[in-house]
């Protein structure tokens, strides 16, 4: 009986260890995007595109989606280095700060580009979520994105007037490689993209490139010119015909699959 019990414990431990080592770690940048606000008591708090922010401006819903798919969510409050990115499978940089948003913004520097580029080359999955040109630090962000053939344009595309949601509608074709279930999405006031090899457009609106993917070394880069799937547009606020919640699920599944594929190729 003791032998059976010991064997059972060993099997359970092995399964737990296996699940732990295969879970994808998704790290959200808190260094280039570091906005703060004061509460009613005057205390300073981080907000805007963080896992912890449960208001309209946060990514708490996206974090829940990723966890539901077996991922581990993390954040990085320091500059990306080889050591700091160790153990991260998916690294998300969203809406780097301008001086309008943060008194002393942390701009993306050459050493950051070098570290991230090597990490992607080794199999990392990088997600770049910008913003329209008036609300993102574009110059330094482009020094990073251009390492993978992607440039965020200095524009403000797909403007929406108030609650005229249809002005922000895009239609995803069936059989899309990333968005397998989402068909009608809401995405407004973004920067469009210009690309060159190795980047490829995965979604266009006429001649405007909206979403691009770049395969670099053993890794992958996903880019769109808007923070997009934060709580405001994934928690039921939009009219029912919009599939932003499905898009968030589709993108999460695709990113995790990319990370698994890249990790397998690194063996």
Question: Where do the PLM segments sit?
Answer:
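Bacterial Sec-dependent N-terminal signal peptides
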Residues: 1-24
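Short, surface-exposed patches at the edges or C-terminal ends of soluble domains, predominantly
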Residues: 22-267
């Amino acid at each position: 009986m003791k032998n059976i019990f010991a064997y059972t414990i060993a099997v359970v431990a092995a399964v737990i260890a296996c699940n732990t080592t295969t879970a994808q770690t998704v790290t959200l940048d808190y260094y280039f995007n570091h906005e703060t606000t004061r509460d009613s008591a005057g205390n300073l708090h981080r907000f805007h595109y963080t896992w912890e922010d449960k208001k309209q401006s946060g990514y708490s819903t996206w974090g829940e989606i990723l966890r539901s798919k077996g991922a581990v969510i993390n954040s990085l409050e320091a500059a990306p280095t080889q050591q700091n990115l160790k153990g991260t499978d998916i690294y998300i940089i969203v809406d780097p700060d301008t001086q309008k948003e943060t008194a002393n913004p942390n701009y993306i520097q050459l050493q950051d580009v070098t570290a991230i580029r090597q990490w992607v080359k080794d199999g990392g999955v990088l997600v770049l979520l910008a913003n329209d040109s008036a609300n993102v630090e574009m110059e330094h962000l482009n020094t990073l994105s251009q390492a993978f053939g992607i440039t965020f344009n200095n524009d403000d595309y797909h403007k929406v007037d108030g609650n005229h949601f249809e002005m922000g509608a895009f239609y995803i074709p069936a059989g899309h490689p990333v968005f397998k279930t989402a068909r009608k999405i809401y995405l407004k006031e973004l920067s469009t993209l210009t690309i060159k090899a190795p980047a490829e457009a995965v979604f266009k609106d006429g001649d405007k490139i909206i979403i691009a993917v770049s395969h670099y070394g053993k890794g992958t880069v996903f880019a769109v010119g808007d923070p997009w799937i934060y709580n405001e547009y994934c928690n039921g606020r939009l009219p029912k015909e919009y599939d932003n919640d499905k898009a968030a699920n589709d993108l999460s599944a695709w990113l995790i699959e990319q990370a698994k594929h890249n990790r397998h190729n690194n063996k």
